[in-house]
Amino acid sequence: MTLDDFEMVVNVHLLGAAYCSHAVWPIMREQNYGRILMTTSPSGLYGNFGQTNYSAAKLGQVGLMNSMKIEGAKNNIHTNSIAPVAATRMTENLMPEEVLEKLGPELVTPAAIFLVSEDAPNGVILQAQGGQYSLATVVENNGLDLGVEASADDVAANYEAIVDMAELKTRGMLQL
């Protein structure tokens, strides 16, 4: 993949979302209400072979959503993301026919409609595939305080405790 190919996909998926949001933002702010729905992808959330450009752009949309949810909250502007898996021209050669038959795009629609409704949450990523819906989110564990004198050796020696996922939390901003 050339850098031009990489940039083209980022321009379409990430900058396209930014341009569209930028166009409607003043209107939503003025009316003190709005709903924006980004279309991210499981490829952006988890990665996918051969899709580094697409994956980077789609996860970039999640970062955009995370900031927009904070900036828009005071004006009742909710920004959410949907991560669909559906049978489309883009996926028809990636999955067997019997799988594609269960992934009609119409099965993504209920989640999309909810995420732009008056009752929509703010800052949520819903995955939708074949009638199954789930939350995707960034989590953080409790970590381990090694102190201000920590070295790379300290991190290595305590790595298992640092990455222990027994207790998870979500939070929006770095809290010290």
Task: Locate the predicted segments by residue.
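Active-site loop-to-helix junction immediately N-terminal to the catalytic Tyr of the SDR YXXXK motif
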Residues: 1, 47-55, 67, 95
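Catalytic Tyr-X3-Lys loop
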Residues: 2-18, 33, 37, 61
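Short alpha-helix in the Rossmann-fold core of NAD(P)-dependent oxidoreductases
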Residues: 10-17, 21, 49, 57, ...
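A short, exposed helix-loop element centered on a Lys and neighboring polar residues
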Residues: 21-22, 66
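A short helix-coil junction within the Rossmann-fold of NAD(P)-dependent oxidoreductases
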Residues: 23-32, 118
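Residue(s) in the substrate-gating loop at a strand-loop-helix junction
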Residues: 41
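Active-site-adjacent segment of SDR/Rossmann-fold oxidoreductases
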Residues: 46, 62, 67-77, 118-120
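C-terminal helical subdomain
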Residues: 81, 99-176
